[in-house]
C-alpha cells in the first residue's frame, strides 16, 4: 500500500512538473506574442472552445483579449486577427510577411503544401502567376466566359422549368451549373447534368467541404496527428478527397495522350505545355503533382463557394419577399423579359448589386479565412510573431464589423447603398480575402453570382414551404466553412 501511495504521489508530482514546465515554456515562447488564455499540454485551449461554434468561440475570446490574441488549437499555436483594422494591417500593410499558407488539416491530408491554394513561397507565386494568366487566356474576365455562363444559365433555367413548380432541394441544381463553368476552363468541356460520375464528384466536394464545418472537422484541426490514424468521419472526407484527386489524374493522363503543344484545349493542356518547356529546369514548380492539385484547387473552389452562396441567397430572398420584389422590379425595368442579362447591366442595377453583396456578406462562406503563416520574424503592432507562426484572419469579423455595417447581424442591402439609392463600396467587404493571396477567382465569381441570380430571377418567383416569418436563416454549420440550412423551394414561372 505504501509503495502504491508513493508511486501515486510521484506520478502526480511528475505530471504537475510537466504542466508547470509547459506553461513556462509557452510563456517564454510567447513573451512577445499577443495575449490569450493559458494552454494546457497537448490539448491547448480545447477546454475554452466549442468545436460546434468555433468562430463564435474565438470571437468570445477576443472580447476579453482584444482584436489580436493567441490561441492554441491542441498543440497548434495560432494568432487570431479580428476586425477590419487588424486584418487589413496584416494582409495588406504587411502583405509579404503574412503571405505564407497556414494549415488546413483536412485538405492538407491530400495537398501537403502542393497546388496553388495550399502552397507557400516561390511555389505559390509561380503557380498563382501561371493560373491567373491561363484563366485569362481562356476567357475569364472577358466576353468569352460571360457567354459560357449565360449558356449554362440557360440549361439551369430549363432544369427548373422541368420541375413544374414542385418543391426541390436546389443544392445539386446549383452545383452542377456553377461547376460546369470552371469545368469548361480546366477540362475544356461541360458535363451533362445527369452524368453519374459528375454527380459523384459533386457529392465528394460537398461532403469534404461540409466536414470542415462540423464539430469533428474542427476537432480534426486540433488533433490531426492522432485522428488521421483513427476511424471516424474524417476517413470519409479523406476518401472523398482521394476520389477527386483520382478523377483529376485520369483527366490529366487523357490530356497527355492527346496533347497538341501548339493548340491547348484547356488549363490542363496549358500546364502540360509549361511542364515540357521547363523539363530541364531543376527548380521548376511545373510537374505532375502541382498540375493535379492546382487543377483540383480550381475545380473545387470554382464549384462550392459560388453554389453555396447562391443557395444561401435563395433562402434569404424567401425570408425577405420585399427585397425579392425590388430585385424583380429592377430586372424588369433595366433588362426586361426578352433578352438575357449581361454583366454590364449591373452598372444600371445598384439595388441588385447591393443585394448580391449583402448575400455574400451575410453568407460569410469562409468565416475564419484561409490560415496564413508569417514568412519571417514579424513585428505586428506591439507584438513579435516568430517565423512560421500561424495566423487566422477572421474574415467573418470583418464582414460583421459594426464600424462598417450599421446592423451587421441583419440582412439589409442598405449596407451597400448610399442615401440616393446608388451602390456604394465598403472597405470591410472581404469575402474573397485581401492582400497578396486574395482569391484570384474573384472576378469570375462576381460575374457568376450576378448572371446566375439575374437570369433565374428574370424567369422565376421563389416560394418556400414556410411563411417568411418562420424561415430560419441561421447557418446549419459554421467551422472552416459556413453551411446554410437544408431546405426545399419551388420555382414559379413569372
Curated annotation (Swiss-Prot):
<feature type="modified residue" description="N6-acetyllysine">
    <location>
        <position position="379"/>
    </location>
</feature>
<keyword id="KW-0349">Heme</keyword>
<dbReference type="InterPro" id="IPR017972">
    <property type="entry name" value="Cyt_P450_CS"/>
</dbReference>
<dbReference type="GO" id="GO:0005506">
    <property type="term" value="F:iron ion binding"/>
</dbReference>
<keyword id="KW-0408">Iron</keyword>
<keyword id="KW-0492">Microsome</keyword>
<keyword id="KW-0256">Endoplasmic reticulum</keyword>
<dbReference type="GO" id="GO:0035634">
    <property type="term" value="P:response to stilbenoid"/>
</dbReference>
<dbReference type="Pfam" id="PF00067">
    <property type="entry name" value="p450"/>
</dbReference>
<keyword id="KW-0472">Membrane</keyword>
<feature type="binding site" description="axial binding residue">
    <location>
        <position position="439"/>
    </location>
    <ligand>
        <name>heme</name>
    </ligand>
</feature>
<dbReference type="GO" id="GO:0042168">
    <property type="term" value="P:heme metabolic process"/>
</dbReference>
<comment type="similarity">
    <text>Belongs to the cytochrome P450 family.</text>
</comment>
<dbReference type="GO" id="GO:0071276">
    <property type="term" value="P:cellular response to cadmium ion"/>
</dbReference>
<comment type="function">
    <text>Exhibits a high coumarin 7-hydroxylase activity.</text>
</comment>
<keyword id="KW-0479">Metal-binding</keyword>
<dbReference type="InterPro" id="IPR050182">
    <property type="entry name" value="Cytochrome_P450_fam2"/>
</dbReference>
<dbReference type="GO" id="GO:0020037">
    <property type="term" value="F:heme binding"/>
</dbReference>
<keyword id="KW-0503">Monooxygenase</keyword>
<keyword id="KW-0560">Oxidoreductase</keyword>
<dbReference type="InterPro" id="IPR001128">
    <property type="entry name" value="Cyt_P450"/>
</dbReference>
<feature type="modified residue" description="Phosphoserine">
    <location>
        <position position="131"/>
    </location>
</feature>
<dbReference type="InterPro" id="IPR036396">
    <property type="entry name" value="Cyt_P450_sf"/>
</dbReference>
<dbReference type="GO" id="GO:0005789">
    <property type="term" value="C:endoplasmic reticulum membrane"/>
</dbReference>
<protein>
    <recommendedName>
        <fullName>Cytochrome P450 2A5</fullName>
        <ecNumber>1.14.14.1</ecNumber>
    </recommendedName>
</protein>
<dbReference type="InterPro" id="IPR008067">
    <property type="entry name" value="Cyt_P450_E_grp-I_CYP2A-like"/>
</dbReference>
<dbReference type="InterPro" id="IPR002401">
    <property type="entry name" value="Cyt_P450_E_grp-I"/>
</dbReference>
<keyword id="KW-0597">Phosphoprotein</keyword>
<keyword id="KW-0007">Acetylation</keyword>
<dbReference type="GO" id="GO:0016712">
    <property type="term" value="F:oxidoreductase activity, acting on paired donors, with incorporation or reduction of molecular oxygen, reduced flavin or flavoprotein as one donor, and incorporation of one atom of oxygen"/>
</dbReference>
